Regions:
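Bacterial N-terminal signal peptides
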Residues: 11-21
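Long, contiguous binding/interaction regions
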Residues: 29-147, 154-293, 299-332
Length: 332
């Protein structure tokens, strides 16, 4: 047997070296690919459950726990607001709320503050001073007396730090108003309601809850997986459509909020307007959400069943998965 030539041995060594080199390069390339934003979206975040006792201790109030989230709500009982002769009470959308959700750095908050025109500037300044963010300022009503605005805030950090920041903002509202909004009595009474709620449920396709004369639907979007900074935004956290009815069968009022994907916006507006319901605001609530979501506030006065038909027509312009009683979501 002839000995293996030098050139043949060199070829074998070169082939082995090439295989090892390209195999290692491929693995390194794969590692590099996983370092971008896309990897962050798919990365499993390790989060600790919220310690609700910390929130309660710092804020000095109790909230409601739901599927790992904790929400505090402050009814604005010190504000006496009317629109077109209808009294707007907290159940009709006159309530400040802040939701806490567990996140990788401790907690993420989202909230909606009810503010008077005099509150707006000092509360804005306090939010920025605390290192929180403002993501939306808008109205819910028109022709309302006095005029009220709604300001959305957000932030994240350790649970204790975030709760302390929220406390500072809520304390600023008390300071400017000259008292605790929840302790007032101006909006703390029931409104008249003689509506046929069964007929409303049949038309709208959902069941609602009655609170002090306000019959309110809260409808989630289970067809949309919404995230803000990697944290899931739920119905409980404000990702929902709602409608609040009061009054009599022939003279009712409905106020509410629609949540919409961008392509649904013109369709929902058209359906509401064609049914005589005023669209009073179109806006965002968040700025880093995925996918992009818009919100719309509306106000209608008239025959209760006709208003419900208008609401149903607008709902039909959103996800078809959301159009049956099986998808019912009760009020948060």
């Amino acid at each position: 047997m002839k000995p293996i030539s030098f050139s043949f041995r060199s070829g074998i060594l070169f082939l082995l070296f090439s295989i090892l080199f390209f195999s290692g390069w491929s693995q390194e390339k794969t590692k590099i690919k996983t370092k971008g934003p896309a990897h962050k979206d798919t990365m499993v975040m390790h989060v600790s459950p919220l310690d609700t006792l910390v929130i309660e201790r710092i804020l000095g109030m109790k909230g409601k726990f739901n599927n790992g989230e904790y929400k505090v709500t402050i009814p604005q009982n010190d504000l006496s607001v009317e629109v077109d002769g209808f009294k707007i009470i907290p159940a009709m959308g006159l309530g400040t709320w802040v939701d806490f959700a567990a996140s990788s750095d401790g907690a993420m908050i989202m909230g909606d503050l009810v503010l008077t025109e005099n509150d707006l500037k000092p509360v804005q300044q306090e939010i920025i001073r605390q290192g929180l963010t403002i993501s939306a300022i808008h109205n819910h009503f028109i022709r309302n007396h006095p005029n009220v605005m709604y300001m959305h805030l957000g932030g994240s950090g350790s649970l204790e730090q975030v709760a302390q920041k929220v406390k500072a903002v809520l304390d600023k509202i008390k300071e400017v108003r000259g008292g605790d909004p929840s302790k007032g009595t101006a909006s703390n009474e029931a409104v008249p309601n003689s509506l046929d709620t069964r007929q409303l449920d049949t038309i709208v396709g959902y069941k609602a809850e009655m609170s002090k004369g306000v019959y309110k639907y809260t409808i989630g979007r289970p067809d949309v997986s919404l995230k803000e900074h990697g944290v899931t935004v739920t119905t409980f956290m404000g990702f929902n459509t709602w409608a609040a009815f009061q009054g009599s069968p022939d003279h009712a009022a409905v106020a509410g909020d629609f949540t919409m994907l961008e392509n649904e916006v013109p369709l929902v507006i058209k359906a509401l307007v064609e049914h005589g319901i005023e669209v009073v605001a179109v806006h965002n609530h968040m700025v880093h959400e995925q996918p992009r979501i818009f919100f719309l506030h509306y106000w209608g006065v008239g025959n209760a069943l006709q208003l419900a038909q208008g609401l149903r027509a607008a709902l039909d312009q959103t996800s078809r998965k959301n159009n049956s009683m099986s998808g019912m979501h009760m009020n948060p």
